[in-house]
């Protein structure tokens, strides 16, 4: 049965990739017929002022040079923040501003993003390398007392960091991504989650996703953050200048290929040994309950894979929770990092595991 189950998964994945890629190709072809070449003209956007007045640094890892922004006292407890797709360090701007008075705040650009190096091969974006980047970053900078905060793809990576290198971090803050084993449970039992995951299959394809993202003045990127379905609900927290910052980063040559390669190598991720599936550091999961991409059931199911885990549902917030409701996110993070003062706020549910 194992062979046939694996064969079915391969066929199913290939079929969905074909369907979504064909749909995207037909849409782009239609746009070419109706709007002409102008639709596909690529623009490189200037760097806005909002990206300039920060403390930018680089560190040389074994295989890449990584860019990061650092704010706050050098001797403070470390808050290390890891962004998702399609984001970059600036997605943590509200947390950098809030916590810089008490913590050594660091927000990185993951490999392939912004001014961090962009390896050319798809296999260079395997989860093994992504986890290793975080491990090396922590060890080379000799970071101690680390709270690791992560969103989206950053959370996919940091769940693994917490499982494989639990000695490097004290606490883990996860924004809108379930534990990988919890995601598999939700995906297998929920048709709604499988439908929400359509983009994963589209992004497996070569070239077409890049064309779609960079065409039409990057309207696809705008829709992700400002659209009615998936976008940030509290629009005042994502300004025109913020949108320009995103376009500036992802309009650079090669600016979309590296991030998309995360998806292209996703199914080659090494299996996590069962004995390591339980996360040992304390975990806080923050979850915007209007996530267009991930079912909130995954957050609750994640508790069983953690030794000590709390889940805070944030009502009226999108997938981009730390940008959408930064004040609440900051309060929850602050209370979690100062464990003695932690408590749920209002009517937001709290779960705690008993492992």
UniProtKB/Swiss-Prot annotation:
One Pfam family named in its UniProt record: Abhydrolase_1
Keyword Hydrolase: yes
One function term, GO molecular function aspect: epoxide hydrolase activity
Any GO BP annotation: lipid metabolic process
Catalytic reactions on record: an epoxide + H2O = an ethanediol
First-level EC class: hydrolase
Phenotypic effect of disruption: RNAi knockdown of both ceeh-1 and ceeh-2 results in the accumulation of 9,10-EpOME and 12,13-EpOME.
Annotated keywords: Hydrolase, Lipid metabolism
InterPro entries: AB_hydrolase_1, AB_hydrolase_fold, Epox_hydrolase-like
Pathway: Lipid metabolism
Function: Catalyzes the hydrolysis of epoxide-containing fatty acids. Active in vitro against trans-1,3-diphenylpropene oxide (t-DPPO), epoxyeicosatrienoic acids (EETs) including 8,9-EET, 11,12-EET and 14,15-EET and the linoleic acid metabolites 12,13-epoxy-9-octadecenoate (12,13-EpOME) and 9,10-epoxy-12-octadecenoate (9,10-EpOME).
Similarity comment text for this entry: Belongs to the AB hydrolase superfamily. Epoxide hydrolase family.
Misc remark: Less active when compared to ceeh-1.
Protein name, per record: Epoxide hydrolase 2
Gene that specifies this protein: ceeh-2
């Amino acid at each position: 049965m194992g062979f046939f189950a694996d064969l079915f998964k391969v066929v199913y994945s290939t079929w969905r990739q074909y369907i979504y890629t064909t749909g995207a190709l037909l849409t782009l072809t239609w746009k070419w017929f109706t709007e002409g070449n102008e639709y596909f003209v690529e623009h490189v956007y200037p760097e806005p002022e909002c990206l300039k007045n920060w403390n930018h640094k680089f560190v040389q890892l074994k295989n890449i040079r990584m860019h990061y922004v650092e704010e706050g006292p050098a001797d403070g407890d470390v808050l290390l923040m890891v962004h998702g797709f399609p984001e970059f360090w600036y997605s943590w701007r509200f947390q950098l501003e809030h916590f810089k008075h008490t913590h050594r705040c660091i927000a990185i650009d993951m490999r392939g993003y912004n001014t961090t190096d962009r390896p050319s091969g798809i296999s260079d974006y395997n989860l093994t390398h992504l986890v290793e980047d975080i491990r090396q970053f922590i060890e080379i900078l000799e970071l101690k007392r680390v709270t690791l905060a992560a969103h989206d793809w950053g959370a996919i990576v940091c769940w693994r960091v917490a499982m494989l290198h639990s000695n490097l971090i004290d606490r883990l803050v996860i924004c809108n991504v379930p534990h990988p084993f919890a995601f598999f449970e939700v995906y297998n039992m929920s048709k709604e989650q499988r439908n929400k995951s359509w983009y994963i299959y589209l992004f497996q394809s070569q070239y077409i996703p890049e064309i779609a993202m960079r065409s039409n003045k990057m309207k696809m990127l705008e829709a992700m953050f400002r659209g009615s379905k998936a976008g940030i609900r509290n629009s005042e927290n994502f300004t025109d200048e913020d949108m320009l910052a995103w376009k500036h980063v992802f309009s650079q040559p090669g600016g979309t290929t590296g991030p998309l390669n995360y998806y292209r190598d996703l199914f080659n991720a090494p299996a996590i040994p069962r004995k390591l599936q339980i996360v040992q550091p304390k975990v806080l999961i923050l979850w915007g309950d209007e996530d267009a991409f991930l079912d909130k059931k995954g957050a609750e199911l994640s508790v069983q894979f953690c030794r000590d885990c709390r889940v805070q549902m944030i009502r009226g917030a999108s997938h981009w929770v730390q940008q959408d409701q930064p004040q609440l996110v900051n309060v929850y993070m602050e209370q979690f990092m100062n464990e003695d003062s932690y408590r749920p706020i209002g009517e937001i549910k709290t779960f705690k595991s008993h492992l």
